[in-house]
Amino acid sequence: MTDDAFPSDRLNHILVAVETIEESLGTLARKQQLTRDAYKSDSDTQDIVERRFVKMTEAAIDIGEELVKQERGPPPQSNPEAMRALGDLGILTPSTAEQMAQGARFRNVLAHTYGQIIDHDVVYNALPDLERYRVFVVEIRDYLDSIGALDG
């Protein structure tokens, strides 16, 4: 880490992003009880799930970009790279970094597809796989705690 104290505006941005992830996890966890047929037949639910995945992953990417800029200066060149850089910096475990890089790629697919182009089976299949985001939040909080950013 740089020798400078962790800037409060950067920390606030990260903490708001963590809250967004946690809220999205709650919403998506409630949608896990839907059957595949119920999910695929309800376009409102599809929109909610897709949007929450996008918001949650964008929040994680924002966290990654903020921490990478704090730690090494230049921002990452891509969304998946932001997640891998957190692994390179020891902020995330290598496994979590790679899983979040996959999540960033999934976000790119969701953000740039619409209507009948979206494979709703792929999105439904992602619903049970929320653990990567939970672990991400834990590792980010652990890192912030380890550098004293959460003190005071």
Annotate each predicted stretch with a short phrase:
Residues M1-G152:
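Solvent-exposed interaction patches of small proteins and small membrane subunits
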